[in-house]
Amino acid sequence: MKQITLHVYQSLDGCPVGADKHFDAAADASYCVLIDEETYLRIYLNHLGWPLTAKETLVVTGGCIDLTEKERVRFVTGDAAAELRRIKADGEGTVTAYGAGTGALLLDNGLADDIVVITVPVLVGGGEKALECGLNDGRTWVVRSSKVVEDGKIRTVYGKVCP
């Protein structure tokens, strides 16, 4: 069974900050990358094209916004939770997930196996949070590891405690 790891990049006050080389390394080591529509558009526009060509990318979306018809991008529409359960059950490997919408989908449906939080030592302010969702699966999350990485960033890995 595949493991789904949600990556969250946040400021000290919980606001979103851009992903960095930690995400790139996780994406390189994974079976595929899972993102939401907003993250897909942001990545595409920031790079003036699609930079994630080595891996299949799954984009959870309400419709088709395909700007990358020649790349390895697949759009997950309809019942995304059911499709992700099917993908998770098929084979081995890690799915690297990123984006607030993706995080909400995974956590609200009990699909995330691990959460990797990179906390950047800045205060951003504002109402938007890096992860805005309710944890509806009723499971407890425990810290599996925590360490200071370069530039004072803190990498914390949380894992589910299975009932």
Label the predicted regions.
Residues M1-P163:
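Enzymes that bind and transform nitrogen-containing heteroaromatic metabolites
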